[in-house]
Amino acid sequence: MVSRLLSLVSLCLLGAKHIEAGVTQFPSHSVIEKGQTVTLRCDPISGHDNLYWYRRVMGKEIKFLLHFVKESKQDESGMPNNRFLAERTGGTYSTLKVQPAELEDSGVYFCASSQ
């Protein structure tokens, strides 16, 4: 049963500052079964047009997934496959959806923002 579980972990480590409200990402972690859908959300720092998604698989380096400017995708060269869908609504928050999730999707997912 444990081997059927898929852990998708979402942490906010990039782009946050103590001076102002930082990037907010949730859920902070998610454990799901293979085949289920997981949706991660990133709220950038207010006024930031650029939003980035990254993923780190255990034992490997952080990999770029995609970059938005406002609601427009600028570069999605790092998106793994067609089961991954990212959107940015009105240039504000972004969602990253994995459907259906597979074991190889396990990892730490990061988002960051910049002006």
UniProtKB/Swiss-Prot annotation:
Disulfide bonds join 42-111. The keyword Repeat does not apply. Pfam families: V-set. InterPro entries: Ig-like_dom, Ig-like_dom_sf, Ig-like_fold, Ig_V-set, TCR_beta_variable. GO terms for cellular component: plasma membrane; T cell receptor complex. Keywords: Adaptive immunity, Cell membrane, Disulfide bond, Immunity, Immunoglobulin domain, Membrane, Receptor, Signal, T cell receptor. GO terms for biological process: adaptive immune response; cell surface receptor signaling pathway. The keyword Membrane applies. PROSITE patterns: IG_LIKE (PS50835). It is found in: Cell membrane. Its main location: membrane. Residues 1-21 form the signal peptide. Residues 22-115 form the Ig-like domain. Alpha-beta TR is a heterodimer composed of an alpha and beta chain; disulfide-linked. The alpha-beta TR is associated with the transmembrane signaling CD3 coreceptor proteins to form the TR-CD3 (TcR or TCR). The assembly of alpha-beta TR heterodimers with CD3 occurs in the endoplasmic reticulum where a single alpha-beta TR heterodimer associates with one CD3D-CD3E heterodimer, one CD3G-CD3E heterodimer and one CD247 homodimer forming a stable octameric structure. CD3D-CD3E and CD3G-CD3E heterodimers preferentially associate with TR alpha and TR beta chains, respectively. V region of the variable domain of T cell receptor (TR) beta chain that participates in the antigen recognition. Alpha-beta T cell receptors are antigen specific receptors which are essential to the immune response and are present on the cell surface of T lymphocytes. Recognize peptide-major histocompatibility (MH) (pMH) complexes that are displayed by antigen presenting cells (APC), a prerequisite for efficient T cell adaptive immunity against pathogens. This is T cell receptor beta variable 14.
